Amino acid sequence: MMAKFPITDQGFEKLEHELKHLKHVERKKVSEDIAEARAHGDLSENAEYEAAREKQAFVEARIKHLEDITARAEIINVAKLSGDSIKFGATVVLIDDETEEEVMYHIVGEYEADITKKRVSIASPIAKALIGKSVGDIVEVMTPGGVKSYEVVTIKYEELVF
């Protein structure tokens, strides 16, 4: 069995919801699509049948993947966390030393990261640089554009909305 990994309780619920949907809705729909395509006769030249079989393979692979993820997840209720230093689950406000603009990041598990929502994976370069830091600390992060420097302004632990 592979190692456990952290995930927020909201992130875990989202994965479980997707898993249930795949098992109880998509799996049934794909089976119906295959049966309907079979009814059209010759399977060797049946594009609908091939498409349905491909979708079935995708759905089954995704179910297996999600079952593996949920079995290895270490669920963390971020709202119950606290502390003065940055760790998994923190919502961090930083000041970019160059532009003096505020940026905010939520440090989450790898399966719930979404940069468009400012959620960064615990394994990302920015999160790795931030872990263990406190308010007032200066953090240097290697980015594709070079080294960026930030000052930690606030650290909070609160539930995220997914």
Swiss-Prot record:
Per the database entry, which stretches of residues form a coiled coil?
44-69
- Pfam families xrefs: GreA_GreB (PF01272), GreA_GreB_N (PF03449)
What InterPro entries does UniProt report for this protein, alphabetically? Answer: GreA/GreB_C_sf, TF_GreA/GreB_CS, Tscrpt_elong_fac_GreA, Tscrpt_elong_fac_GreA/B, Tscrpt_elong_fac_GreA/B_C, Tscrpt_elong_fac_GreA/B_fam, Tscrpt_elong_fac_GreA/B_N, Tscrpt_elong_fac_GreA/B_N_sf
Keyword annotations of the record: Coiled coil, DNA-binding, Transcription, Transcription regulation
The residue range of the signal peptide is none
Gene Ontology biological process: DNA-templated transcription elongation; regulation of DNA-templated transcription elongation
The molecular function terms in GO held by this entry are: DNA binding; RNA polymerase binding
Q: Where are the transmembrane segments?
A: none
List, alphabetically, the SUPFAM superfamilies matched. Answer: FKBP-like, GreA transcript cleavage protein, N-terminal domain
Q: Which cysteines are joined by disulfide bonds?
A: none
Purpose of the protein: Necessary for efficient RNA polymerase transcription elongation past template-encoded arresting sites. The arresting sites in DNA have the property of trapping a certain fraction of elongating RNA polymerases that pass through, resulting in locked ternary complexes. Cleavage of the nascent transcript by cleavage factors such as GreA or GreB allows the resumption of elongation from the new 3'terminus. GreA releases sequences of 2 to 3 nucleotides.
**Of which family is this protein a member?**
Belongs to the GreA/GreB family.
What name does this protein carry? Transcription elongation factor GreA
Q: Which organism is it from?
A: Rickettsia bellii (strain RML369-C)
Q: Lineage, please?
A: Bacteria, Pseudomonadati, Pseudomonadota, Alphaproteobacteria, Rickettsiales
